[in-house]
């Protein structure tokens, strides 16, 4: 069975999980502005609790944002460092996809639309569907003024902070925060199917200079 480390620090909440065989060891706490200081010690504590070492990891999964500039750069850099040092591969998911995964467990639907917080009049959107336990998504950045409910499937469910901007949509999971345990579930499936990526392919989606959503290339 696989040993996987999953990390999401895209919000004020630091969420880290380790999957070992059929066990899950998790840390999920709101620690604003403390991610850089505490992330490595949190990982070390979970490795100790799970009786694993870095050398025994088969993959590292990371939530790549959008979200906190510092948080997602940190999680991606840490994931890359571990992957390079252990000569293993990784899995990445948008942090918006993690919201849809949780929402699908609470209120199943064929399609989910996760909407980010607004930045300079724009929102980042992930439109996701599920098949064989995995998630497939289309991403787009649009002006809040151009958002139309009619542009999405009639039976879709909405989730994310950005839902509050649009009275015509109902947030099916208010207050949802990306959770690494859901990232772990997808990571296991992709590892089993050998759908992994190289360390250098783990790229954050972040607020560039706090002015615009930008994906590093």
PLM region spans:
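Surface "functional belts" at beta-alpha junctions
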Residues: 22, 31-34, 89-178, 206, ...
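N-terminal beta-alpha supersecondary unit
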Residues: 1-64
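Stable alpha-helical structural segments in soluble proteins, enriched in small hydrophobic residues
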Residues: 46-50, 85, 103, 180-191
């Amino acid at each position: 069975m696989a040993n996987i480390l999953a990390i999401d620090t895209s919000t004020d909440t630091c969420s880290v999980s380790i999957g070992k065989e059929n066990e899950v060891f998790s840390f999920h706490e709101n620690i604003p502005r403390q991610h850089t200081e505490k992330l490595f010690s949190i990982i070390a504590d979970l490795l100790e609790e799970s009786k694993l070492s870095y050398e025994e990891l088969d993959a590292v999964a990371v939530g790549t944002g959008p979200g906190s500039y510092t948080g997602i750069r940190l999680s991606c850099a840490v994931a890359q460092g571990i992957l390079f040092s252990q000569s293993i591969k990784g899995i990445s998911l948008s942090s918006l996809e993690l919201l849809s995964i949780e929402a699908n467990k609470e209120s199943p639907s064929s399609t989910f639309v996760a909407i980010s917080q607004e930045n300079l009049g724009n929102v980042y959107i992930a439109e996701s569907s599920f098949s064989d336990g995995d998630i497939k998504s289309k991403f787009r950045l649009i002006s809040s003024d151009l958002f139309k409910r009619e542009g999405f499937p009639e039976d879709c469910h909405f989730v994310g902070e950005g839902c509050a901007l649009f009275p015509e949509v109902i947030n099916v999971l208010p207050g949802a925060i990306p959770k690494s345990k859901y990232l772990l579930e997808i990571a296991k499936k992709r590892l089993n199917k050998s759908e992994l990526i190289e360390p250098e392919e783990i790229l954050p989606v972040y607020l560039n200079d706090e002015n615009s959503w930008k994906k590093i290339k």
